Amino acid sequence: MNNFPEIFDDESTCDYDKEIDHQELSDTFWCLMDFISSKHGKSVADINSGMNTLINIRKSLNGSGKVVSITDSYNKTYFHSQRGLTNVDSRINIDILKIDFISIIDDLQIIFRGLIYKDKGFLDSADLLDLDKKTTTRKFQEYFNILKIKIIEKIGMTKTFHFNIDFRNTISPLDKQRKCSISSSHKKTNRLNDLNNYITYLNDNIVLTFRWKGVGFGGLSLNDIKI
């Protein structure tokens, strides 16, 4: 059912020598979110007809971008990178539609997540924080660049990184208490050093999560990532 192997080829590689235009990346994200938003309430088959947009996005990111999944608030899958389009006769009219978009930059795997609300349409950070889109994008860029530099300085680029941006309508009291946190936990594996370390920064309705897998923090402390 997946008619777009060019997008979802897991063996695709990136030209890491190419300098990444972070403005282009941000513009690409908004472009993708606007496209998905325009399809809200229509059948997934309609989204299928717009996949050429994703092909162009992928090329603009030097072949590194792909959509991972499209699910609703009941975790019903409309699209998955390995299974292709599903439920093609369904209507996307559940409460919330979650979109994950991945781009790999300098060994950093960046996961963008947008939420589409049935009653309000797509809400991005500009809607939630009452800021113009350019200002919000710039703040995200600044945060990402600072965080990336600090991580590289501390532990280098030898690990697998994940950076999530998650727009939420509400933030739980527990999340607010965490505000900005560092933590690590052992996975249930035989390798005691197989850690999943993460940093979460909350700003009103935006949740940013930065995770990496490796041994320990490499000297990284909470003071290193406060901005």
Swiss-Prot record:
GO cellular component, one term: host cell plasmodesma
Claim: Ligase is one of the keywords in the record: no
Record's keyword terms, sorted: Host cell junction
Matches recorded under InterPro entries: Crinivirus_P26 (IPR009985)
Subcellular location: Host cell junction, Host plasmodesma
Primary site of residence: host cell
One Pfam family, short name: Crinivirus_P26
Disulfide bond residue pairs: none
Keyword Membrane assigned: no
Protein name, UniProt field: Protein p26
Assembly description: Self-associates.
